[in-house]
């Protein structure tokens, strides 16, 4: 007999077990069993824990092996750590939704120094009392200023998308270097 050990790598099978073992005769086919893991998307069975060698269930059994489940977070959000308003007039927010809930990315109004009309406060680095406002806008922000910048509903396939926040030139700016922070909130529900 040949044996195939399937390690759920932190996930579990229907029987709440973390491992499944199948025994087959050479030439028979292994059965693919899919485990589940809270907050994660199953991304396949691999022959190694670095997930470089994906297992092919369409091939007949020839040797005993151990397979490892690869897990990916249900969602990924990419936001640049910083941008320079000297070169950029927009900030791109990217997202991938692999799960069954809706992913939304918006501004965290409690943590961001921003006006009701979505103008970001920029402070002069030499004298923080000298400030200016940089107007922000994104799709739908004119009618609903608190609207999420990016929303990805769950789909039958993995959904990917991006959205752009426009950043206008600061108003009433004086000479000097200015800095400001945007804090985003990510919801997955």
Regions found by a protein language model. Name each.
Residues 11, 40, 75-77, 120, ...:
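Short glycine-aromatic motifs
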């Amino acid at each position: 007999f040949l044996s195939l050990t399937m390690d759920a790598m932190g996930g579990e099978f229907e029987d709440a077990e973390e491992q499944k073992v199948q025994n087959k005769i050479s030439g028979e086919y292994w059965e693919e069993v899919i485990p589940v893991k809270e907050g994660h998307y199953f991304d396949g069975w691999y022959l190694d824990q670095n997930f470089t060698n994906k297992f092919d269930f369409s091939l007949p059994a020839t040797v005993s092996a151990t397979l490892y489940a690869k897990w990916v977070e249900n969602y990924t959000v990419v936001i640049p750590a910083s941008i320079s308003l000297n070169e950029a007039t927009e900030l791109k927010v990217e997202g991938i939704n692999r799960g069954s809930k809706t992913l939304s990315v918006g501004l965290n109004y409690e943590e961001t120094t921003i006006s009701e009309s979505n103008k970001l406060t920029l402070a002069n680095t030499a004298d923080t009392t000298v400030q200016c406002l940089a107007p922000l806008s994104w799709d739908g922000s004119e009618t609903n200023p608190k609207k999420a910048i990016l929303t990805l509903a769950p789909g039958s396939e993995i959904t990917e998308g991006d959205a752009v926040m426009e950043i206008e030139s600061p108003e009433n700016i004086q000479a000097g270097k200015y800095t400001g922070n945007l804090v985003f909130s990510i919801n997955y529900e």
